[in-house]
Amino acid sequence: MNEKACWQLPQDKESVYRHIFAGGVFAYPTEAVYGLGGNPADERAVCEILRLKGRTAAKGLIMVAGNWAQCCGWVSGVSKRDQAEMMDWAGDYPTTFIVYAGEKLCAHVATADGKTAIRISQHPLIQELCALIGQPLLSTSANLSGQEPARSVAAVRQYFPDLPMVLGALGAAERPSRIIDWHSRQVIRA
């Protein structure tokens, strides 16, 4: 791992790209809190995120993408109509949707019932990261399981002192994304 690396886009895009596709994990700002990211197709990244957080795989993990085109093969059963409706439901607030998992995901990203979670993010840095790698990115809050999510670089460093980071500004959301099961329309987190 590149100890305590602090990257900025676009100037460090090659280092970030190599890190992601080498199975690396890193912290980065999201719409409301700092997240832990990695490649959802790489079991090393998934297992490292679970280890860092002290969390089991039972809950699955969230992915973020910059647009629906990046989700092809990562989610399934989401029609163009569903995509448009999800964007309408989300409005301006970050909203994560639970949908059926696609074939590209590695173990532990999907739940036992074959579902996964995806958020199409309007955050400029997330859009830039996903455009760089051409696919979704794992995204879970940068904290130990059960603890408060990190809202500053200092808080990320307190939880994960040696974790590489992509620097940037947090979005304007005051709390983590709401989560909705798209098929049942059940609100999991408001």
From Swiss-Prot:
- Is Magnesium one of the keywords? no
Q: Does the keyword Cytoplasm apply?
A: yes
Principal place where this protein is found? cytoplasm
Q: Which domain of life is it from?
A: Bacteria
Q: Name one GO biological process term.
A: regulation of translational fidelity
Catalysis performed (reactions): L-threonine + hydrogencarbonate + ATP = L-threonylcarbamoyladenylate + diphosphate + H2O
The YrdC-like domain is annotated at: 10-190
GO CC, any one term? cytoplasm
Recall the GO molecular function terms of this protein's record: ATP binding; double-stranded RNA binding; L-threonylcarbamoyladenylate synthase; tRNA binding
Where, per UniProt, does this protein localize? Answer: Cytoplasm
Q: Which PROSITE patterns match?
A: YRDC (PS51163)
Catalytic activity, EC: 2.7.7.87
Protein keywords: ATP-binding, Cytoplasm, Nucleotide-binding, Nucleotidyltransferase, Transferase, tRNA processing
Q: Which family does it belong to?
A: Belongs to the SUA5 family. TsaC subfamily.
Function statement: Required for the formation of a threonylcarbamoyl group on adenosine at position 37 (t(6)A37) in tRNAs that read codons beginning with adenine. Catalyzes the conversion of L-threonine, HCO(3)(-)/CO(2) and ATP to give threonylcarbamoyl-AMP (TC-AMP) as the acyladenylate intermediate, with the release of diphosphate.
Give the PANTHER family listed for this entry: SUA5 (PTHR17490), THREONYLCARBAMOYL-AMP SYNTHASE (PTHR17490:SF18)
Protein name (record): Threonylcarbamoyl-AMP synthase
Natural source organism = Dichelobacter nodosus (strain VCS1703A)
Q: Which gene encodes it?
A: tsaC
